[in-house]
Amino acid sequence: MEKRRVVITGLGTVNPTGNSVAESWAAVRRGECGVGPITRYDTSNSKVKLAAEVKNFDPAARIDKREARKMARFTQFAVAAAAEAIEDAALNLEQEDPTRCATIISSGIGGLPIMEEECLKGEAKGYDKVSPFFVPMTIANMAAGQVAIRFGLKGMCTSPVTACAGAESCISPLGVGGFTSMKALNPTDDPARASIPFDAERGGFVIGEGAGILVLEELGHAQARGARIYAEVVGYGSNCDAYHFTAPAPGGAGGADCMRLALRDAGVQPEAVGYINAHGTGTHLNDSCETAAIKAVFGEHAYKLAVSSTKSMTGHLLGAAGGVEGVFTALALHDGYLPATVNLRVPDPECDLNYLPNEGAERQVEYAISDSLGFGGHNACVVFKHWEG
């Protein structure tokens, strides 16, 4: 069966580095880190006091105020980012067949802060007093549902709950506390040393929030309407470590196999890849295993390609990580700029690739990879190709 070519024609994001693609990408190019003190709740009794929060987000800029009140924060992020992406793609949805327009938006946890608030309300006033919007605001698939409703998209609508593309907001006492208890978060109080992927002094990730949306379009359709094309999606791989519920398989075996699957699907040789937007969380196991996986797949070429983790600037956006990093990878190919891994100061002998420490690179590459590796052993890898027009 002949594969139809798929291109990226629109981008949208809300994340700790900015509330639009232009604002965020400019900050990433400057190497600005979005990590800072948690402002959403009192951290006096919390070990972890830093997070990568979205700043100055006004849902009313893109969402009707009455509708926004019925949405959890993660859904607001998704709808705002989707509105930007569709506008960026210059799509006139009234001229499209809505049954041919799908909506796929992930969330790792959904409306966790709403769960906390309504649980406390239920305990204090009785559970019959919780908000009638509690369930629809909380469930993880509501980001995709609300985007489909807003734009009248009647094709497949789904929400894969893995380390995939979508929206997330779980900077809350319960969310941060849960990750703290499992020793996944870096407890430092220094924002410049908190999210430091591949650094020998890394001590866990920094929780973040946001959304990243990409408009994917069949090439012929995009060309027929004269759409701007950021990059082409040429391959995809997905598998499972089936090893441990939080730890990666030894040596990054599952992640390596996932990259091989994606390259095979793309019909691309490893030596053709010039950049990897790594999962790069800043935990000891993830970064060393991902580095080992890259070496296993690329051999000596691993030392020639550029690898970076934009989580050094955004923190770990959980279910939104893949979407936001997909936006950055598409822009890296489109603009010929590979973002840095900021705040990487102390080399780790186990992590000895070119992670573009503290300075990005003006470099045009033909192929780039974006990796996402999630709890439960979920692995996903997308291969992007530079669009030459």
Q: What do the PLM-derived regions correspond to, one by one?
A:
Residues 168-203, 236-250, 278-287, 304-354:
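Acyl-CoA/ACP chain-elongation machinery
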Residues 1-67, 220-232, 327-342, 385-389:
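ACP-dependent fatty acid/polyketide chain-elongation machinery
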Residues 8, 21-25, 29-165, 169-176, ...:
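Conserved beta-ketoacyl condensing-enzyme motif
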Residues 22-27, 113-127, 177-189, 250-251, ...:
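A glycine- and small-aliphatic-rich helix-loop capping segment at beta-alpha/alpha-beta transitions
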Residues 5-9, 33-37, 190-266, 275, ...:
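Condensing-enzyme catalytic core mediating Claisen C-C bond formation in acyl metabolism
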Residues 130-135, 155-162, 199-203, 305-316, ...:
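Short pre-catalytic strand/loop immediately N-terminal to key active-site residues, enriched for Gly-Thr
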Residues 1-8, 97, 266-272, 302-303, ...:
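Flexible, low-complexity linker/loop segments at domain and module junctions
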Residues 78-91, 140-168, 206-227, 316-338, ...:
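Active-site-proximal alpha-helical scaffold in enzymes
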